[in-house]
Amino acid sequence: MTTEFDRSEQRLAHLEAVIKKYRQDFYSVGKALKEIRDARHYHKLSFKSFESYLRLRWDMGRSHAYRLIDAFCVIDNLSPIGELLPKNEAQARPLTKLDAFSQRRLWREFLKTGKALSALNIKKFVSAHLGEQNTKASFIEVISNDYQQAVREMLSQISL
């Protein structure tokens, strides 16, 4: 008789085998890492946190793991659209900044451009779209302009 705990341990063993076998396949690894994180399977191996599990078990940093998980989520969201999908994590990364609907819409628009499927082309396309949405000056630009004006006023008050 198999208990729930046994099934959970078997599932963890399977997920870790996926990570080991497909270390270069961002989709499979991201999917496995997401399930390990969400189901807290790492506790079964006596790890207190997902981050310590990543570091000690896979020599993987938190940010890299989360990029893989985010890329998996993008591919999972885009997969109903068609067969042409981002081929690696770097190509999927710019789309992670968008909500699910915007990801699908922008991906369709990108494919219509006929541009080569590269991380740089996708990043430029998404950045251009985000630039249209964010027409307000950035906080840094506003502070910079205010600072420059204040410095000019102070310099004008100094007489040599």
What is each of the regions a protein language model found here?
Residues 1-28, 136-138, 152:
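Short, charged, low-complexity amphipathic alpha-helix
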Residues 75-160:
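Amphipathic alpha-helical oligomerization/scaffolding segments
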Residues 6, 27, 43, 48-51, ...:
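Compositionally biased, low-structure terminal segments
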Residues 20-98:
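Short, Lys/Arg-enriched phosphate-binding patches
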